[in-house]
Each structure stands twice: as C-alpha cells, then as structure tokens.
Regions:
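Early extracytoplasmic/lumenal segment of secretory-pathway proteins
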Residues: 29-95
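Extracytoplasmic ligand-binding site segments that recognize negatively charged/polar headgroups
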Residues: 39-43, 83-84, 89-226
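Paired acidic/hydrophobic, glycine-rich loop segments that form the ligand-binding mouth/hinge
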Residues: 82-88, 214, 231-236, 252
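A ligand-binding cleft/hinge motif common to bilobed small-molecule-binding domains
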Residues: 92-96, 226, 231-250
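Periplasmic-binding protein-like
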Residues: 135, 164-173, 201-207, 214, 247-271, 284-308
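A bilobed periplasmic-binding-protein/Venus flytrap-type ligand-binding module shared by bacterial periplasmic
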Residues: 138-145, 184-188, 263-276, 283-284, ...
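Extracellular/periplasmic bilobal clamshell ligand-binding domains
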Residues: 310-347
C-alpha cells in the first residue's frame, strides 16, 4: 500500500525525530558536555570544533542533540549541577537563558578569540554568549518539480494554495518557526511582531489547501524532497547548499523578496558547568574553526578573519540582504505565538 504524500512525510518526521532527539543522553561520562543540532550541522560541529578541542586538550566531549528550549529546561531543572556545559541556540533562546540566570557572563579574558569577532555579531550575546555563524531561512526546491520558483513570499503562499507544488513547512516545535514563519509572514502580510494574526492566517490558508506537509526536524525535508513527497520547503540556506553538493544536485535555493529571516547560532557557557567550557568556546570563536565550519555548512561566520572558498562566498547570507527581526521581542512573544499556533494550526 502506498501512503498519501502527507502521511509518508509524517512517517519520516516521526522516525527521524525519534532517532535524532527522542532520547538524548545527558550522562556526564565525558569531561565536557555540549549541545548540537542534528544532521550535517552536527557532523560539521564535531569535525571543526569538537575534534580540534579534544586534540588540543586531551579531554573528551559528549555531544547531545535536541532543541534550544529542551536544553534550557534541562539546565533549569538542575542549575546547581547542570547536565550541559556549553549550549548552542538562537539569539532569542539565548536571551531566555540569560534572563533565567542559567548562563555565565563572558569576556576576552576567558575567551581570547572574542577579539576576532565582528562587533555586530558579538553584540547579540549581550556579554553572555556569541554567535558562531548565521544563515537565512528561505526556500529550498526541486529544480525539476519547480522550474520557476516563487520570487516573493506572497507568490510562495499563493502558489502553495493553488496547488502549483507541495510544500514543506516547519511545525511549531522546529527551531526556526517562531521568527522564520510566524514573524516573517506577519511582517509580509501587514501585521507586526505585536500582531502576528495576519501571518498565522496565511499558514492556515496553506494548511487548508492540503498542499502542505509539516516537519519537525532538519533531515526530513531533505529526504522528502529527494523522494518527491514535497517539491519545495522553507529551509536554511547552508543546509540546502550542503545537501545540493553532497547528495542532490537537483536542489535549488533562493531568498524570496523582501528577504529571508536571519538566524545567528548563539553559543553560551552554562552557569556551574565545567570551566573547560571557556576553552571550548575559544575554539568556537577561532578563525580556523569557523573557516572549517562556515565552508562545510555554507553559513556566514562571526569571526572577521574567516576564509571562504569562492563558491561558498557567493552563496552565504549577507548582513544587508537578510531580514533581522527583533530578537528581544521574539523571545518575549514566542510563548504567546506557540499558544496561538497550537490553537489555530495544531502542528
């Protein structure tokens, strides 16, 4: 029996979600415990940061997968003896961790390579972390299935509703949904971060059309695009290009007008975590480590001395071309947005 496209996509999401983040171990067997996103991101993180740190120090590192709020809640459940030493996340989730008193203040005394970071990037951490890199959340598509991809976000929404393609959208549990979908569409459709209903209305339109599958983890859109279960998806630029180069040359990527939302990846030292976390963060801030990471994942690095290949330089997100939503507002509004999404969309 062949399942309908939405059910096949859902089956993939359930399986991969369980494998990737269903039961992360937080046992403190290693000298340092750090977090990472899954898929190609984890592989690059290990190669460019974890392995060099282990080689330099002789210490061992556990890498656990999951999502920022999951890690924040784990640390918050036992702040005196946290199960994590260094957390990655978004700027808005980093602000939540800072406000809850779960992370340490940092300086170039503990992390000398902070001096190499771009001031605008360093500023997002407010002294309690820094971005490793940032990417845009635009559209990944099959060049065969979508030979004329939408050039604006409104064309994407209208084309999905009209059935020009079957689209993949992130569900509410995905890391990019709050600002990359809700905040984006609210802005595009005449609302604001204080009034996101116009954006949610567009997600409801697409869902009602039957031409959307929702995903909750980063690998499922890649698999669904390759299998033909979806034709186009809202997705991160670097991950899309990495998949194009490694497995699927049919993939195309673009940032529809008026732009795609920028997502810096924040890193923070957990309060009461191992002091080795500072040494690890110094590797994360290094030009060598970020050059490796940025070229593998094709993200724009925070270290000003990073060297890109010519191909990667032409693809990475540019500060002036991205949409930068207010992270402070997003962090405060996200619980309200999640409740609205759950009531109106439910996935």
């Amino acid at each position: 029996m062949t399942l309908p496209r939405p059910l096949r996509a859902a089956a993939v999401v359930i399986l991969l979600s369980f494998n990737a983040v269903g039961a992360p171990s937080v046992a403190r067997a290693a000298d340092l415990t750090v977090t990472a996103y899954g898929g190609a991101w984890e592989q690059a993180y290990r190669k460019c940061f974890v392995q060099p740190f282990e080689k330099q120090t002789g210490k061992t590192v556990d890498v656990i997968l999951g999502s920022p709020m999951q890690w924040i809640n784990q640390v918050g459940a036992n702040p005196a003896h946290p199960p994590i030493d260094v957390m990655v996340g978004l700027v808005d989730s980093g602000e939540i961790a800072r406000e809850r008193g779960l992370v340490d203040k940092i300086s170039d005394a503990e992390i000398p390579n902070l001096k190499q970071l771009k001031p605008n990037m360093l500023g997002y951490g407010k002294g309690y972390g820094f971005p490793i890199a940032f990417g845009d959340f635009g559209l990944m598509y099959s060049k065969k299935a979508v030979p004329n991809p939408p050039q604006t976000w409104k064309e994407f929404v209208d084309g999905t509703v009209a059935g020009k393609w079957h689209a993949g959208l992130p569900g509410i549990s995905y890391v990019a949904t709050a600002q990359g979908v809700i905040g984006l569409f609210a802005t595009v459709y005449g609302g604001s971060l204080d009034n996101v209903q116009p954006g949610l209305d567009q997600v409801k339109r697409m869902k009602a059309s039957g031409n959307v599958s929702f995903y909750s983890e980063p690998n499922s859109p890649l698999i669904s695009l390759r299998s033909g279960d979806i034709d186009i998806a809202m997705y991160f630029d670097g991950r899309a290009w990495a998949e194009h180069d490694a497995n699927n040359p049919d993939i195309g990527y673009l940032n529809p007008r008026p732009g795609a939302v920028a997502f810096p990846t924040m890193v923070q030292k957990v309060k009461n975590g191992s002091p080795l976390g500072y040494q690890f963060m110094n590797v994360l801030a290094s030009a060598e480590g970020q050059s490796c990471f940025a070229n593998l994942l094709q993200y724009s690095a925070s270290n000003r001395d990073v060297k890109y290949s010519d191909q990667v330089r032409s693809r990475i997100a540019k500060d002036d071309d991205s949409l930068w939503l207010s992270f402070d507002v997003v962090s405060k509004k996200t619980p309200e947005w999640v409740e609205m999404w759950n009531k109106q969309i439910g996935r």
